[in-house]
Amino acid sequence: MENFNAPFRFDYVGSFLRPEHLKQARADFEAGQITKAELESIENEAITDLIKKQKAAGYPVITDGEFRRSYWHLDFMWGLEGIEHIELDHGYFFHGEETTHGSVRVTGKISGEQHPFVEHFKFVKQFEDEHTIARQTIPAPAQLLAELFREDNGTQTLAVYPDLEELIQDIAQAYRTVIRDLYDAGCRNIQFDDCTWGMFCDKNYWEARQKDFVSLEEEAAKYLRLNNLALENAPEDLVLTTHVCRGNYHSTWASSGGYEPIAPFLFANENVSAYYLEFDDERSGGFEPLRFVSDDKKVVLGLVTSKSLILEEKEVIKKRIAKAAKYIPLNRLYLSPQCGFASCEIGNKLTEEEQWAKLALVKEIAQEVWG
């Protein structure tokens, strides 16, 4: 495995469409109709089949497709000590659709011991071979901080943590614990998924936030510092990357806007080796902000949408790669879908066959561009 370094010329973000029988099994478990052991057996079988398909598609990365999760972010948060699962009276309001209502609440000191995702990773790790590496995706620490202050959640958060600095330090330490445990389990590739930066790009979001007397610079500095604290003392051979997301629920989106507002903060100063960036439509803006990416970092261009079954034209994607290469050398660019195919259990509006066709297209284009 020492010859593998993410990102790869053709890559993907992590989540895959759940098979219908897996969705049914999870519903049956919630209804008390099957046991936890029976659900885990069905999950294991579905993940094993997914990894076979990932390998057959020729991709060097294997994941569990986030098949054991309901949400891309909340399940990880619920696995931390001091955090509990709550249901709000409404979900996130995406473009034309409302999400389900799950959220988090602080109940005590936050820590990361014995996180269930470590065992989840071990199951994937066993399928690694000389051609593949197992990746673990987790929500960024900044995402947890944002969720803890989402609407009324902040009241409980401040009741438990009146000192914001103590909260930041505990979140960072919890993440360092999980990262070390994943590393000890054999993980060498961890991807932060982070919607906080996507929201910073959105003008409407920031106009709404002005009532809190919060500046973008202050919030960006706080989130960046937290993410970097969580990455302190990470092993040198652990590849750490960030996927910046604008929301991906049932083929809808949450935020719009180019990367210009966040680029000077994030692209130059986050202590990761690569960014997976959404560039699948006009909502993402142009490639000009890539000029802020520091010379030691790589960029995975999310030019192929995971929200639609329509296959992009190869030549259009190649021309867009060439445009991006005006700001970052081609040898530091890579290609992927813009996001996962099922950031939440409901999944996007395409079939499994259409999902694999998207990944085949990404691979074909990458091989034609980079050889």
Regions found by a protein language model. Name each.
Residues 1-371:
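Domain-level signal for soluble alpha/beta catalytic cores
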